[in-house]
Design a protein with these regions (language model features):
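Anionic-ligand binding patches
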Residues: 35, 41-44, 79-226
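Charged/polar low-complexity intrinsically disordered segments
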Residues: 14, 27, 34-36
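Short glycine-rich, Thr/Ser-proximal phosphate-binding strand/loop in the N-terminal lobe
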Residues: 62-79, 154-160
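N-terminal beta1-alpha1 ligand-phosphate binding loop
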Residues: 38-61
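Aromatic (phenylalanine/tyrosine) cluster motif
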Residues: 11-18
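Cationic, low-complexity basic patches in intrinsically disordered or flexible, solvent-exposed regions
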Residues: 20, 29
Length: 226
């Protein structure tokens, strides 16, 4: 697998016609000046993830949670990782936006990629252990697609981060799996939880690995005047 230099990105996704957004200093100032706008906008997070809720609260003062009903198994299997998460994030946002057409809907989707294989959430403890053995002592990639939809306007972007695990013995893996933490996490680990001691290094956006790339999201929200 050809690995990009840390920090570089080159994504395109014709189906949703998105363009990566460069967040300038003036946009950041405008974001600060327009905080009061948040009070008049019905903002919905289309995710039940407690981690995404915690991260979004750092950017948005008030929002509500309406989990999307989009079936992630419907994502086309032939998509590259960046396109995979963009497709899923956009479909999640559209699902909720269709029910709340006046709201601003935020959604995200995260996957772990190693050896060109996409690792989602493990189905059971055995699969969690298998995933962790794949990650042991190696560098993998975490992709998160984030989408924002309001009325007929849709913006989306993707973030990529490299994470390197230290060597994991069978005992360490068994103990971590027994904690239950891997079971609802892409790639079978939570960087913000017990797995932090298993990780040797992170290259790129840390919140992206948790599940919501805050810089990308802030730049997208600025396009909506928020």
């Amino acid at each position: 697998m050809t690995r990009r230099r840390c920090g570089s990105a080159d994504y395109s996704y014709q189906a949703f016609s998105y363009q990566p957004i460069a967040c300038s200093t003036s946009q950041k100032h405008r974001l600060t000046a327009q905080k009061e706008v948040l009070l008049s906008v019905d903002i919905i997070l289309a995710s039940a993830s407690p981690r995404r809720q915690e991260l979004l609260s750092l950017v948005v003062r008030t929002f509500r949670v309406v989990p999307s009903g989009f079936d992630e198994s419907l994502v086309p299997v032939d998509l590259a990782p960046a396109q995979h998460v963009l497709y899923s994030a956009c479909m999640k946002a559209r699902d909720v936006a269709a029910r709340f057409p006046d709201a601003l809907v935020i959604s995200a989707d995260t996957i772990v990629v190693v050896d060109e294989a996409i690792l989602g959430k493990p189905a059971d403890a055995a699969e969690a252990a298998r995933m962790l053995r794949m990650l042991s002592g190696r560098t993998h990639e975490v992709y998160t697609g984030v989408a924002v939809v309001r009325a007929e306007v849709e913006r989306a972007d993707v973030e990529r981060t490299e994470v390197t695990f230290g060597p994991l013995s069978d005992e360490i893996i068994a103990r971590y799996v027994a904690s239950g933490e891997p079971m609802d996490k892409a790639g079978a680990y939570a960087i913000q939880g017990r797995a932090v001691v298993l990780i040797k290094s992170v290259c790129g956006c840390y919140p992206n690995v948790v599940g919501l790339p805050l810089h990308k999201l802030s730049c997208i929200l600025s396009e909506f005047g928020i």
